[in-house]
């Protein structure tokens, strides 16, 4: 059984070697799986996402996010997209809030903010790990796709940025990564273009095309793998278009990407 955040509620034994976790195991991961079967003093939840059309689940290892990856959004955030190289940040796996297809899930308004923003994003799920991945092979590492929201405490992000401090507190908190189930790339193909939009209470806020990304999904995989070895279970939030904006309690957020079922949450 899983709750809305994707946690397995029963024993973790075998998690690392069953179902979708068997996507691509390295020797190091196999060793880790052996260790995982040993007795521990307490249980640590494993975040998983359902796989559409399957009884498998996708185990989430790391949540990577790219910043300012659409030119118009970079400009509205005060950056010059023609000069700046890509940069990435991470959210904790327990930031994930699973949103089933066809449901409007309650999304809690977080503490410590008075300026809570939506960001609609295509999410790539990694099934084959690697280091220093080449561009021509990058998409071979993608196992599936879904859509997700990078919810942001914008006032805290801005405050920390002005102080030249890391703005993790504005991005990495409970429920800050609503996300749909994983769709296998064998069923969807790769998403290089297509409409991406977000509505709040039925009115369009964000509206763009995936082909307007500054750095494509393949290029993001290349850049990420130069800094960190990627592993099965990593997911990549690939950036948001312009017109991010605030939401308040009672607002309903609906997100769309061509070729994927819509995602909807209600801020409570």
Positions of predicted regions on the chain:
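N-terminal secretory signal peptides and thylakoid transit peptides that target proteins
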Residues: 1-18
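Hydrophobic h-region of N-terminal signal peptides that target proteins for export
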Residues: 20-25
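Extended, compositionally biased flexible segments
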Residues: 34-132, 137
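Catalytic-pocket segment enriched in acidic/His residues
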Residues: 34-57, 73, 100-103, 154-268
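Hydrophobic, well-structured mid-protein blocks that either form specific transmembrane helices
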Residues: 132-169
